[in-house]
Amino acid sequence: MMTYIVFILSTVFVVSFVSFSSKPSPIYGGFGLIVAGGTGCGIVLNFGGSFLGLMVFLIYLGGMLVVFGYTTAMATEPYPEAWTSNKAVLAMFITGVLAELLTACYILKEDEVEVVFKFNGAGDWVIYDTGDSGFFSEEAMGIAALYSYGTWLVVVTGWSLLIGVLVIMEVTRGN
């Protein structure tokens, strides 16, 4: 059951990015990013990263939602274009969705799904020692992995958010 939930969330995630990349109006582009952020957090939550999912949800959808609202207010159109108003955009959107479905069907045809990477050094994880036995805390492992193995991910995420804010400020600055 969890595999199907992750599959559905992944499909919604990719379709929302397809809708963002073929945005005819800033309103729908911001909506596509908001849906992508929410479903991405749902995927992270399904894999047990409740702290990371909550952190991304609060930072991304809390902070960037203000920027999306501001840019939408600055770039409102009396008659915004929808995906169906331009036939080329609609055709590209449908082509992207069909490509995603065909790729998903091809992947699901295989019998097993393999993990892309493996962690071999269990000594790097945070272990809580309670006398005779120790146990791993999922939250502490996630934070430790984020800042030890995923240092580049934190740097790229911070840099992307900074560049995104600067681009949005430049676009909405006007003449």
From Swiss-Prot:
Its EC number is 7.1.1.2. GO terms for molecular function: NADH dehydrogenase (ubiquinone) activity. The chain crosses the membrane at residues 1-21, 25-45, 47-67, 88-108, 149-169. It is found in: Mitochondrion inner membrane. It catalyses: a ubiquinone + NADH + 5 H(+)(in) = a ubiquinol + NAD(+) + 4 H(+)(out). It is a multi-pass membrane protein. It comes from the Eukaryota. Pfam families: Oxidored_q3. GO terms for biological process: mitochondrial electron transport, NADH to ubiquinone; mitochondrial respiratory chain complex I assembly. GO terms for cellular component: mitochondrial inner membrane; mitochondrion. Keywords: Electron transport, Membrane, Mitochondrion, Mitochondrion inner membrane, NAD, Respiratory chain, Translocase, Transmembrane, Transmembrane helix, Transport, Ubiquinone. Its main location: mitochondrion. Coiled coil: none annotated. Core subunit of the mitochondrial membrane respiratory chain NADH dehydrogenase (Complex I) which catalyzes electron transfer from NADH through the respiratory chain, using ubiquinone as an electron acceptor. Essential for the catalytic activity and assembly of complex I. Belongs to the complex I subunit 6 family. Core subunit of respiratory chain NADH dehydrogenase (Complex I) which is composed of 45 different subunits. PANTHER family: NADH UBIQUINONE OXIDOREDUCTASE SUBUNIT ND6, NADH-UBIQUINONE OXIDOREDUCTASE CHAIN 6. This is NADH-ubiquinone oxidoreductase chain 6.
